[in-house]
A protein has these predicted regions:
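Multi-pass alpha-helical membrane architecture of UbiA-family
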Residues: 2-302
């Protein structure tokens, strides 16, 4: 039986009275943006099997940062009334008024504009795909009003980091959209999606009863006590696909070691989740992707 302290953890909460900068950083969950970066770079490195040009790496970071800022702000804005009713999320800055609705809308508009500008400077294919990528990101908070597959929608956003990193570099070498799509390291894209379903469920399981009362959908609500094993199954599939990616894309021993560590850290996160410590489980699960991303990058770079 899971023992969950539902009021103890919220990655987007800001209970302390600190500077406006601190409040913005908590609001945007800025650390998660940096944790996503290695997976975007993994996509870029695996796609061309060499170190990408530094300007492109900088543009990948900027694009990821601006789009994630827009997406996270939109998520908070769309859910502000729901968050106000949830004991776990009622300290979020948009709920408490530390950040205003007007500020949030301004952040979204500026961030989306800067994302499209960054994508334009990456390459033609990145730019023409940018509206579709933005649509996937910005529509997420509304999906959970309708379907449990919102967990996979969120996970697909994480997979888009790998996809977008690959497009950013492949567009430098190919003039055909088909060639760019063929060069995407799809095994790692799909592995990332299954990995992300697990950590998203760690976020939703503590809120399952509340979400059910609000008419919100997730696999945590749909599956009840079976949601945690379902999260573990998704992550097992993720590890298998990551190993297949190592093999299919002819990566070396460092990548394989990183994949083993990736799986072991996820296993520990699953253990923590079984103990009801979803806060630590959530972050250890993110750490596992950082290990995988950095390991694959080092493997190719050396």
């Amino acid at each position: 039986m899971l023992l969950i302290n539902m009021h103890s953890w919220d990655p987007g909460g800001a209970t302390e009275s600190k500077s406006k900068l601190y409040i913005y950083l908590r609001f945007l969950r800025i650390e998660q943006t940096f944790f996503s970066l290695p997976m975007a770079y993994l996509g870029a490195f695996v796609a061309i099997k060499r170190i990408p040009p530094i300007p492109i790496l900088i543009l990948i970071f900027l694009s990821l940062f601006f789009l994630r800022t827009a997406g996270m702000t939109n998520d908070n804005l769309a859910d502000r009334e729901i968050d106000a009713r949830n004991p776990r999320t009622r300290t979020r800055p948009l709920v408490t008024g530390k950040i205003s609705v007007k500020e949030a809308k301004t952040i979204i508009a500026l961030s989306l504009a800067l994302f499209f500008i960054s994508a334009h400077f990456v390459n033609f294919y990145a730019f023409i795909l940018s509206p579709l990528v933005a649509l996937v990101v910005m529509s997420y908070p509304y999906m959970k009003r309708y379907t449990a597959f919102a967990n996979y929608h969120l996970a697909s956003i994480q997979g888009l980091a790998v996809f977008s990193g690959a497009v950013a570099v492949l567009g430098l070498y190919y003039n055909s959209f088909v060639q760019v799509m063929e060069g995407i390291p799809w095994l790692f894209v799909i592995a990332t999606i299954f990995w992300a379903v697990g950590f998203d469920l760690y976020n939703h399981i503590p809120d399952a009863e509340f979400d059910k009362s609000m008419g919100l959908h997730s696999f945590a609500v749909l599956l009840g006590n079976k949601a945690l094993p379902f999260a573990g199954l998704n992550q097992l599939i993720s590890v298998v696909l990551a190993f297949l990616g190592d093999w299919f894309y002819h990566l070396g021993i460092i990548a394989y070691i990183a994949t083993v560590l990736h799986g072991l850290i996820m296993l520990y996160a699953f253990y923590l989740a079984n103990k009801g410590n979803f806060g630590k489980a959530f972050y250890y699960n993110i750490y596992s992707s950082v290990v995988l991303g950095i390991g694959v990058i080092i493997d190719i770079a050396v």
